[in-house]
Amino acid sequence: LAQLGAGGAVCFASGFAEAAGEDASGSDLQARLVAAAGDMPILGPNCYGFINALDGALLWPDQHGCKRVDRGVAILTQSSNIAINLTMQQRALPIAYTVTCGNMAQTSQASIAQALLDDPRVTAIGLHIEGFGDLRAWEALARTAYDRGVPLVALKSGASDHAKSAAISH
C-alpha cells in the first residue's frame, strides 16, 4: 500500500508482537510490517481501526453503535473489545471518533490523541491506556489538551502482574 501511495492503513490481523509468547515469529512479523509501511501511517496491528462519526467514514470490520454527530467525544483504546462496547452505549453520549490502536507498531496512542485534538469538533478525549510508552509524548498531549480546553479522561489498566499479562496477550 505504501508503494501505491496510500495515505494510511489499518492492520486488523493479529498474530504479531502481542502473540510473541505463543509464537516467537510474531515480533519479526510486526517489524516487517513497519518496514513495509515506511512513512505511511498504520493503525495496529491487532486492532479494529477507527470510526469517524463526524464525517461518516470508517475502517471497522464489525458492528458498532455509532451514529452521525456534529461534535462529540473521541474514544481511544488499544482494546477493540472495549471500543465496541463503548460504541453501543445508550446514554446519548455523542461519540465523534472511536479509534483502536492495538499493538501500536508504528503509531502511538499519544500521537493519535494529539491528532484528534486538531479537530475542533472533539469536545473531550477518553483514553483507555494499557501501557505508557514515551512519557514526553503524553506530557505534550496533556499540555496541548489543557491549552485548547479539551478534557482528557484516562483509565489506566494493567497494573498488576496478572493484568499486565492479560493486557499484552488479549
Show which residues each predicted segment covers:
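Catalytic-core regions of core metabolic enzymes
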Residues: 1-170
